[in-house]
Curated annotation (Swiss-Prot):
Protein name (Swiss-Prot/TrEMBL): Putative cysteine ligase BshC
InterPro entries per record: Bacillithiol_biosynth_BshC, CC_BshC, Rossmann-like_BshC
Lineage of the species this protein comes from: Bacteria, Pseudomonadati, Acidobacteriota, Terriglobia, Bryobacterales
Record keyword ATP-binding present: no
Disulfide bonds: none
Keywords from the named record: Coiled coil, Ligase
Presence of keyword Transport: no
EC number: 6.-.-.-
Length: 524
């Protein structure tokens, strides 16, 4: 097993804000309270946490409901112990594989802090409150040939928090069929079948599967929908409603500051934006601010009425981390690019509501390759970044290597001859009539285009005649950049476990380097 690195700025769709957070932190310092990867910053963030014994005891009691056997809770109960938090939506069959990478990064950072004098434990926040079922009702896996396959829960759950959605017929048979032929496919399918049982919920099954997959790591899970956590969240939610006009004004100003710095805002905010939803009758109701009132369809609520029902409120994406950290002694949050961008906006909410802010630490990202795929890439002279232009350009590149050398030499010689002849003609035309030289330039571009077009056609024909190369290209694209997405953002961890074994998370954990800001390419 070995790893190489790719700069995050070389990955598709990396925002300027995220790239600057990683590689030019001085440019984003105004939007984050602490720098990254600095022991003194973590110590300062830990020292800023004012967590009373009463609050700590209430937190431990709430955590024990779902984590009764976790030794980490005994450590968290000790004064001064801080939390390294990460979290994710409770997606089908554990969601995208980066979920696992976030958890493992949190575990490693907590250990590093503990080893360096700041006692810390990892915590995983289950985003059970979210109500966008379409974001979590599916999962992508691949088969033994790296053909992507989407598995889906075909039902609706309008306005219902996804964590409480009951499983009717989870697509375990389809998963088993897709993983068939992979060395550990049956073992992985059995594990999923045991955790995603009909009658369970999305939240419970997600947590149980992660607990089983990461059994060697002691990670307590936080379910904000549990009554004990609703009560713990209530004071901060009450404060957010009370200060809503001022908070909205601060967010609008922060968005202008981000825009002036050349960055975009992750969350759109307007004057009527509500920072909270209302949980009622098993649904998460959208609210809109209208003056001093909140509106849902034809219903109206005063701020005072919502404050009286604070335990039934649910934060929106930009307020959520603040509410989370009002309940937890969070020293750092491990997040992906979008989450790190949230913090640039949320900083103003942290400042007003908590008076402190954790370090926003980008998670480690991975592209995982098997040894055969790595050898194929070496054979064709490919890097991971070569796949980000899509399958067609990649196939053309592979195909160009299959063109008979003599034919390739002839094409290149023809191109050189034409360019030389056109150059001589252009020089004489320019002396005679410059407009004719300009007309020749246009014609030359057309000639070059036609030669390049013929070269691509020749390469495609060579690819058609070489079935193995075509198959290799399809397999590599399906593994590395499936459906034009980064591997970690599309595929679940499950097919990788089915291919490499259930000890893969331990191997990934060992490979994490906290000081590395780059995306890692890991050959297993």
């Amino acid at each position: 097993m070995h790893c190489t690195c790719v700069r995050q700025s070389d990955l598709p769709n990396t925002t300027r804000l995220f790239a600057d957070v990683l590689y030019h932190p001085d440019k984003t310092a105004d939007f984050y309270q602490y720098p990254l990867r600095n022991l003194e910053a973590y110590q300062a963030a830990a020292a800023a946490i004012d967590f009373t014994p009463e609050r700590r005891a209430a937190l431990i009691a709430a955590l024990r409901v779902q984590n009764p056997e976790s030794p980490a809770l005994s450590r968290l109960a000790e004064p001064g112990t801080v939390a390294v938090v990460t979290g994710q939506q409770v997606g089908l069959f554990s969601g995208p594989s980066y979920t696992i990478y976030k958890v493992l990064h949190a575990v490693k950072l907590a250990k590093w802090l503990s080893d360096n004098g700041t006692p810390a434990v990892p915590l995983f926040w289950l985003a059970t409150e979210d109500h966008d079922f379409a974001e979590v009702n599916h999962v992508w896996v691949f088969d033994s040939h790296h053909h992507p396959r989407k598995l889906e829960m075909r039902r609706t759950a309008l306005e219902q928090p996804v964590g409480s959605v009951t499983l009717a017929a989870p697509p375990v048979p389809e998963l088993r069929a897709t993983l068939h032929g992979l060395p550990f496919g049956e073992e992985v399918a059995d594990l999923v079948e045991e955790t995603y049982r009909a009658g369970s919920t999305m939240g419970k099954s997600f947590a149980e599967l992660l607990r089983r997959l990461l059994a060697q790591f002691d990670i307590p899970y936080v379910d904000p929908m549990l009554p004990a956590f609703r009560e713990l969240a209530a004071p901060a939610l009450r404060s957010a409603v009370e200060a809503a006009p001022d908070l909205t004004s601060q967010l609008l100003q922060r968005n202008r500051e981000l825009s002036d710095a050349g960055y975009h805002s992750q969350v759109h905010v307007e004057d009527h934006t509500s920072l909270v939803f209302l949980l009622e009758n098993g649904k998460r109701l959208n609210l809109r601010r209208a003056g001093n009132e909140y509106v849902h369809n034809s219903r109206r609520f005063t701020a005072a009425e919502l404050m009286d029902r604070a335990a039934s409120l649910s934060p929106n994406a930009i307020l959520r981390p603040v509410i989370q950290d009002s309940m937890l002694p969070t020293v750092a949050y491990i997040g992906g690019p979008a989450e790190i961008a949230y913090f640039a906006q949320s900083q103003v909410l942290y400042r007003t509501l908590l008076g402190r802010m954790p370090i926003a630490a980008p998670r480690t990202g991975y592209t995982i390759l098997d040894s055969r795929s790595a050898k194929l890439m070496n054979r064709y002279g490919l890097e991971v970044t070569d796949f980000f232009h899509g399958e067609t350009p990649l196939k053309e590149r592979l195909a160009s290597r299959l063109v008979p050398p003599r034919l390739g030499d002839t094409v290149r010689a023809t191109t050189a001859t034409v360019e030389s002849a056109v150059g001589r003609l252009r020089a004489e035309l320019a002396a005679f009539d410059p407009t004719l030289a300009q007309a020749l330039d246009r014609s030359a571009r057309k000639i070059n285009y036609q030669i390049e077009k013929m070269e691509r056609k020749t390469a495609r024909e060579a690819m058609r005649r070489d079935a193995r190369a075509a198959s290799d290209a399809e397999s590599l694209c399906g593994l590395i950049y499936p459906e034009r997405h980064l591997q970690e953002r599309l595929y679940s961890i499950l097919p990788f476990l089915a291919k490499h074994g259930l000890d893969l998370p331990a191997r990934i954990y060992d490979s994490i380097e906290l000081e590395c800001t780059d995306h890692r390419v890991m050959v297993v």
